[in-house]
Amino acid sequence: MNKILVTLLSVTILVFIAQACSKLEPKAPREEDLLDGPVEGLSHEQSRRFLAGDVAFNDEIFTEQTGLGSIFVATSCGTCHAGDGKGTPFTTLTRFGQTDSNGNQYLHLGGPQLQNRALPGYTPESIPAGATFSKFTPPANTGLGFIELVSDADILAMADPNDDDADGISGVPNYAHLPAFISPAANAIPRNGKYIHRFGKKAAAYNLMHQTVNAYNQDMGITSNYAPKDVYTGIDIDPEVSNSTVQNVVFYLQTLKAPIQRDAANTEVIRGKNIFTQIKCSSCHSPQLKTGYSPIAALNNKTFYPYTDLLLHDMGNGLDDGYTEGSAKTSEWRTPPLWGIGLSPNAQGGQYFLMHDGRAKSIEQAIEMHGGEAQQSKNNYMQLSSQDKEALIKFLKSL
């Protein structure tokens, strides 16, 4: 009898321990809860390049000995894009000096980007007196390869510069000159020697090569064969990062997976999606786009769901920082993709920092800050019942 009791007691203890361990043991996150990771369908060689770019982007921390500075913003790419997610007010960068008919009058004073940190013995930059400026929080990096492959024709098809349909929304592309190291896409549609740009808060970068080279040079003070000018001295110097490293980082950014919607079949999420359309949020945050041709099969002719039109929209006086880039006006901002917005707190310390400078601390606040072309959609949102607002936010958090 005692043996039976001992056996039962032992079994009970083992079951208790197993249950306790199951609660304490960390579980791997679901794939849809992660922002980083490669797009499905890469070949063995493409996976190798992705991993090489991953290491260069996230693990390589520059020092004075490896080319950092002399003035800079960050010491690595991953500093501002933790887990390939959005940045915070602690990782913002500052752009200054409004361009007018005579060009940017502050280029000789370090514009347009402020390098606010410096190596010992050097002086970091400060914003010149009288210069307009804007602070930008780093964006999430996921799905960028899909966005890069949207054709100019498709972007122009969403534009309505004269508001011909009288809906109050008149999105326009940002046209700007290309740097010497960038060749336009085969299907590019230029205007007066300028090309449609699509990356950045004001769509100031043409493609991911443009964005990456600028980040190395302006964020970290790292020269390359593509951008050999030292940001401190203004003199061309030997490259501090190799062509292959830059190209691997570009490939890494191109092949990061797109954010995966969660709980798409939830009835409240579906209802929120319908409300999103009804109050005309989708007029700018276009749900569906398609890539064109790509030598990367995983990106070639794919339909994807970023919730952006890649166009500039006038967002009103409340979001006018007095700073412009390319053909963008001071109050115009590129429609940010909404995919991944529900996962933003994972990279932002458990809370939201939305809008171009992180001023909105919730999705609700971000909506309420919309003005200009988005004023009517904001008004429609404000008139929703509390239940409908909750459904809309639930949908947005599922993206």
Regions found by a protein language model. Name each.
Residues 1-8:
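Bacterial N-terminal signal peptides that target proteins for export
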Residues 8-16:
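Bacterial N-terminal signal peptides
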Residues 21-399:
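Periplasmic c-type cytochrome electron-transfer domains
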